[in-house]
Amino acid sequence: MLDLSKAFDSIHHETLLMKLRTLGVSDETLSWFASYLSDRQQRVRINSSLSNSLTIRHGVPQGSILGPLLFNLYINDLPSVCTTCHVESYVDDSKLYLSFSRKEIEGGLEDLKADLLRVASWCCSNRLLINPDKTKFCVFGSSKMLGQVTIPPLTFMGKDLHVVDSVKDLGVILDKRLSFNEHVDTLVSNLMGKLCMISRVRHVLDTPTLFTVINLFTLFTVINSLVFSSLFYCSSVWSGTCKGNIAKLQLVQNFAARLLSGKRKFDHITPTLKQLKLLPVSDLLYIRDAVQMYKCMNNLAPSYLSQLFTKRSQTHSFLTRNRDSLQLPRCRTALAQQSFVFRGVTIWNSLPEELRNCSSIVSFKNQLKSELLSKWLND
């Protein structure tokens, strides 16, 4: 995980304009961007004191709509400097990664080090600065593999990189065993805290106001906005985690259901969930994975996701009943079977053909949810 010091503030205007020209931006548009970037002023106010104006000679405005876009265009050629590693970037969050076996660990780390030096050289040429003290290094693998190897220190820019057991990437905590235990524990702790705060102010929502008498909908809206929206964030990445973690997430939904219904802590919650028509967390995760697969199969997802899946009809020409089903990837480990690729193929192949052939993602989601809800209520 690379850490770029003051990335947005370090953009060199002339270099950015040159890159925009290389990308085919017209002279008239370049003049507009030059005017947009140049001669910007900034001042600092502390209480009633106001500093003198200072001209900004580097960087793009943070908090603006164009800021992230211009930064992405600025680092657009970064992946091309690496010969072995893959580079993924989201605005100023960049990471280098490569795959190697246990026997190839020394060679893999040498390749990683060589590409890190190339990235450092690119950053120097583009007037960006890598902070080695905050750049993190993590090796992912199975418990067996990690227990059999010794990770040598990786030196970069004269300093040993921090070897960590987990990294946080765009809000998802990736631990070295990809168990997502830390992510789930952190998520549950955070959401339980929010629910506790909501419970303390619930009496306010229960009080009739000028605008509404029945406030159950208001309470549900608050819980949905603050809790459920975070509960399923990036779930396709981690929903293959163990049943114990799914059970922890179910406790969050149970707490929310008790708040909505006024049930006590030790009251049986399943009838309440059915009364509120709340599907269990495992079913909601299933729906989200299925919706993601629908996107992949109907060109609604990025190509790097869609190309991970192959129809059986693409591998042979036999007119079998399941020729439109997906080819299940070979997985030698339980960890691989938790991946979205394996899980997604299993889910998609299990769906009825009429459901897979839905004309829109809205109808697909509604029909799938309706079927699961009907089954859940009748159990």
Would you name each region that the model predicts?
Residues 161-236:
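Basic, alpha-helical interaction scaffolds
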Residues 1-3, 20, 33, 63, ...:
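Short, conserved catalytic/metal-binding micro-motifs enriched in Asp/Glu and His
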Residues 1-61, 98, 295:
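Conserved pre-catalytic core of RNA-dependent polymerases
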Residues 4-9, 22-25, 59-67, 103-110, ...:
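Conserved, non-catalytic sequence blocks in retroelement Pol enzymes and Pol-derived host proteins
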Residues 129-167, 324:
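Short, conserved micro-motifs composed of acidic
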Residues 68-97:
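Active-site palm subdomain of RNA-directed nucleic acid polymerases
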Residues 120-138, 245-314:
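Short, charged alpha-helical motifs in flexible N/C-terminal segments and linkers
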Residues 1, 44-70, 97-104, 154, ...:
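Short, conserved non-catalytic motifs in the polymerase core
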